[in-house]
Amino acid sequence: MAAAIGVRGRFELLSCSGPGWLISLSALLSVVARGALATTHWVVTEDGKIQQQVDSPMNLKHPHDLVILMRQETTVNYLKELEKQLVAQKIHIEENEDRDTGLEQRHNKEDPDCIKAKVPLGDLDLYDGTYITLESKDVRPEDFIDTESPVPPDPEQPDCTKILELPYSIHAFQHLRGVQERVNLSAPLLPKEDPIFTYLSKRLGRSIDDIGHLIHEGLQKNSSSWVLYNLASFYWRIKNEPYQVVECTMRALHFSSRHNKDIALVNLANVLHRAHFSADAAVVVHAALDDSAFFTSYYTLGNIYAMLGEYNHSVLCYDHALQAKPGFEQAIKRKHAVLCQQKLEQKLEAQHRSLQRTLNELKEYQKQHDHYLRQQEILEKHKLIQEEQILRNIIHETQMAKEAQLGNHQICRLVNQQHSLHCQWDQPVRYHRGDIFENVDYVQFGDDSSTSSMMSVNFDVPTNQSDVSESVRSSPVAHSVLWVWGRDSDAYRDKQHILWPKRADCTDSYPRVPLGGELPTYFLPPENKGLRIHELTSDDYSSEEEAQTPDCSITDFRKSHTLSYLVKELEVRMDLKAKIPDDHARKILLSRIKNYTIPEEEIGSFLFHAINKPNAPVWLILNEAGLYWRAVGNSTFAIACLQRALNLAPVQYQDIPLVNLANLLIHYGLHLDATKLLLQALAVNSSEPLTFLSLGNAYLALKNVSGALEAFRQALKLTTRCPECESSLKLIRCMQFYPFLYNITSSVCSGHCHEKTLDNSHDKQKYFAKPQSLDAAEEEPSRHGADEDPVLSVENAGRDSDALRLESTVVEESNGSDEVEKSEETKMSEEILALVDEFQQAWPLEGLGGTLEMKGRRLDLQGIRVLKKGPQDGVAKSSCYGDCRSEDDEATEWITFQVKRVKKPKGDHKKPPGKKVEASQAENGQRYQANLEITGPKVASPGPQEKKRDYQSMGWPSPDECLKLRWVELTAIVSTWLAVSSKNIDITEHIDFATPIQQPAMEPLCNGNLPTSMHTLDHLHGVSNRASLHYTGESQLTEVLQNLGKDQYPQQSLEQIGTRIAKVLEKNQTSWVLSSMAALYWRVKGQGKKAIDCLRQALHYAPHQMKDVPLISLANILHNAKLWNDAVVVATMAVEIAPHFAVNHFTLGNVYVAMEEFEKALVWYESTLKLQPEFVPAKNRIQTIQCHLMLKKGRRSP
């Protein structure tokens, strides 16, 4: 069996002679498979010989024509890709073709509503006659006509037009088309079982003709009686004269009181409905329901809506009828028939769309197939005929045999106990695996300039390797993780149990995550900003005065429109009416007075006089008054003081009252409201650790542990001095070091998150509403200890002293298992996993090389130094890293993993710090046996020269990694959505999620005829021709739509969300927020035109800085419709408006991928990671594109 291979280098090609060299050159330029035969130019035969294919497309009629050769290569590559596409397209069509021919019959047999209805909707009489009796209004017909009066042989009929000439009446519904055309109303035959036939006869005991005469006599005597006109309309309904029914009904409506109009309205609706003016009939019945809610009206309206195809409204009307009259059989049967018909139509519509899509795909497949055949003809036109190829192959084989006899080979020697093979030149090495080559681990070419690994990396590290520890001296230095809140490591020399707590300490101090009421509250002092309140003296007030309390209402109130919305709801919250003193606030208050003997009343007097005679900015004194009322427990006064302080404070200091107000809310258990204030405070100033600590406490109370950890991590990164923060330090470190102790097994945000993102990563944007403001005040930690080596010591108590072994046993994540591993193994692996996040935050990534994977967790590292000393040597059991002392170097071993072929730059003979290639390890004769199973770590391929690997640049994977990676399907459309909450907009303020829905379902419709403006982008083809888009919809956004407002209200159905959006949009068509929500609804529904109508409306009314929200939706629709050039224009506009949102960059990258402009896509995915370093979809797509480009180029080059 022949196997396809590539050509190693051009030196082998140059050694050929005769006409075969040009054929070999063609193989050099095209190693890819031929599309038609799926073969390469070169093959390896069963006896190990390399020869060209007999029927190769690269054997040309004119081998000297380089241009044709290059075109042939392009055609071969193109045909191969085209064939793959055709095969995949055909498989896709066959798999998705709808072959269900018995859909309707099976639906009628299996659907529960169809079974209950027993008959289809089409077999039911939806014109079923209904009426409301006069007796239901306490009216007796006998009181209005003389039943004892004799009737002449030729009785008269009650012609209402002759009784009274009715002027125009606003009550008679003369604006309806059915009423205006009453002369031409059709009159289908009434069924004999229609109940209207028996109503008058049974009641009055006379024939219908006699009753008509009596009604005529009554109208002659009283031409303004609404009862007689209603009786006349009943008479004409029995006679099946719709014109007369309408005339009598109009007069009955004219003279009826409002409460009695429904009798005439139901009569009018029945006639209009039977005459096929069902829409007018629905209007009339709705008017009847406005006056009185009889079940007859609901039942009639249900029939009308069923006939109109408004199935949701019909079912709702039947439900109301059943509520008014439970067990009403006709309503029950029709309700189930309507539901049965509705689901059948939905299935048939879906089948129709599927068949239409299949038809379009078949047409496209036929076009591609015809194009493929044309390209195949072009390929065959330049190819050499098969007989000529065979002749040239014979000549080539003869030449190869001559060269083999002349010694065209190289001699390689085994070194290092036959574990490595050293070859002089970088040429292909041919040998059979076995015999003396069985133990060859890697091959070295030339002067150690290139190595190629031939084994998987599994190490058991002996502890007596002195040469390995030599590399420690040149290892990189990490940032100091002991630089906390402006204090270096010496300041924590006596507090190691706080900064580096042991597991036992954490178990004793914090056996669980503290509850909301157990967390401390804080006070952000103005002194942190360099502000100070002067002390009061006895001259400022008289101590003999009656004790006063600070009254914040006497100050001038200057409202800040920018922030008032944050606190306007707090004034009416019932949660804040209780009096709950805050002990933490009392301690802070007394510490600020610096006199614990002063009673609270005297402190209140201090503040009262300070407000009346301010010797400092008033907002500072109001801030102190807020602390006073917090300590006392009067939340109403505290909010008043802090609200006024917020409105009077300069913009750059507004975070002080915001943070203090948020801590008041935390004390009262309003943690979600507190997070909103804290996020706004971070937008003002992100350099205060107390703000992050307060936010972390709020997230802990909300069960958002991952968000709390992120907030705590941000607090630890700040260099601002914060003595008040140290009380929380031990809790933070315990949660970071021992996540399993608190069941923190993943970084998924499980509580209240303010941003929904596309991944489960530690991303600031996930927890903080304004991520761009978080890094504004971060400073670089001190360079103290910059010459020390980074050390990661892993606890090794109770292990073999002769061989340190890195165990890969960890506790399973989130699988609900109660299985407990061995205590030592669990503790060690738990520490390693707990330090993953700490390494990523504190170590510079250029100091790391590779990836250690354990149970799905990845730890980037260059090497691990393991302390050989045990507890008997006085070394602490806890792990140390970062700024460990240099004297530990003598007691450490470096374990460095290298697993791939690595090319070194020419002339650079230095080994990179902390890294050892396998060649140097092999020359020392130190080979380790496979005892530790590690899937990594793997050193990334260098990529471009001098480009360091960090979160902004992932580096390029090696070919081996590409083969193992799970590639992303780049052709799949990934939908993105930029939430309005990213613009600090609360969607619950625009859409009412609380009020129950009483009316029938609605859909949000935007103005499709909105005039063209400079904002509506009508110059784009996709927008101007939106009615003809081939848009397949984005059902994957359904959950996003249903979860709108989920933080405060339960999840709702798609129809409910659409109805709520429609209700508010109907009242406010100029709201860009509502238009964007309506566009999201239509994106889920798959209605591209209606979605773009709403987006045009949103773009027209949205402020410039908000336009990226509708632009991202528009870019997704155009991307889905394959209008990629338009999508690029729109997505680029979104990036220019809001370059700080990662989703905008990611969307633009997706469009470039669809256009197969992979280099541009890489640029935008890289910029996505700069904004959101752990965004997994962007990382996966970068790796897939890199592998695609690299392997594609690899096929083209030797």
UniProtKB/Swiss-Prot annotation:
A Gene Ontology cellular-component term: cytoplasm
SUPFAM superfamilies assigned to the protein according to its UniProt record, in alphabetical order: TPR-like (SSF48452)
Function comment: Plays a role in primary ciliogenesis by modulating actin polymerization.
Designated gene of the protein: Ttc17
Segments for region (Disordered): 771-825, 903-924
Subcellular location: Cytoplasm; Cell membrane; Cytoplasm, Cytoskeleton
Protein's name according to its UniProt entry: Tetratricopeptide repeat protein 17
InterPro entries (alphabetical): TPR-like_helical_dom_sf (IPR011990), TPR_rpt (IPR019734), TTC17 (IPR052630)
Pfam families attached to this UniProt entry: TPR_8
GO BP, sorted A to Z: actin filament polymerization; cilium organization
TPR repeat placement: 295-328, 619-652, 689-722, 1071-1105, 1108-1141, 1142-1175
Database matches in Gene3D superfamilies: Tetratricopeptide repeat domain (1.25.40.10)
Binding partners and assembly: Interacts with CATIP.
PROSITE patterns: TPR, TPR_REGION
Organism: Rattus norvegicus
